[in-house]
Amino acid sequence: MKHALDEIEVATQRITTNAGNDVVTISVAPNFLTRWLMPRMSRFQDKYPDVELQISASTGLIDFNKSATDMAVYFGHGDWHDIEVHFLRNVFQVPVCSPGLMSGSRPLIQPADLRRHTLIHVSKRLYEWPEWLQLAGVEYTGFSRGLQLSSSQLATAAAQEGLGIALADSTLTSREIEQGKLVVPFDLMMDTHKSFYLVYQKNRLLTYGMQAFKDWVIEEMLDSSVIKETSELGVNKHG
């Protein structure tokens, strides 16, 4: 958990590429920043060495008419008004937990086995686990064990520490899954019906740096694998 808090602290600091004349200020959610953007920053630096990015971590909406922020990545339905909105990708969730939890004394063979484990909830999205369980054909009854945390970032970190099972964005956790830090006990993916979007001030003429970041993040999103084949990840098939 301390590692996750350290990551958030780092994420709130300014991140810059090589100094250049074109500066772009960007606001993104901490989870998106630490799990998706930061691991890919070197590719942006290599492709656009003359663009400087100043990135801050925030989940709030930006008033681009008053803020110095040039661009932001929002998570939602894409129905914000008076800003330019560009779709990046849909968000799907899968259950994730630590490898140790999978090999413990309470095996996870089928979704109903989750009743014997702690479910980790994001406090503002308590509906997610009941919806996933309904999709899996399991009634949300008998789940007395639970842990509520304030963000997806902390929920995923808690799962990695073996504190329970969390629902996580399948793309944002792909590195931890590939590295064996997290495992997917069941391969049932739930469509959140929400997406990531790149947004900025309406009718704004993009600078070279803003256009560069826009082109790059859209390309990277297209190249991002949602999740590896379940056989490679060693997950249980949902049945």
Across the structure, where does each feature detected by a protein language model lie?
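Immediate post-signal peptide segment of exported/extracytoplasmic ligand-binding proteins
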Residues: 17-24, 113-116
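Short, well-ordered beta-strand segments
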Residues: 25-27, 72, 120, 166, ...
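Hydrophobic hinge/microswitch elements
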Residues: 141-184, 191
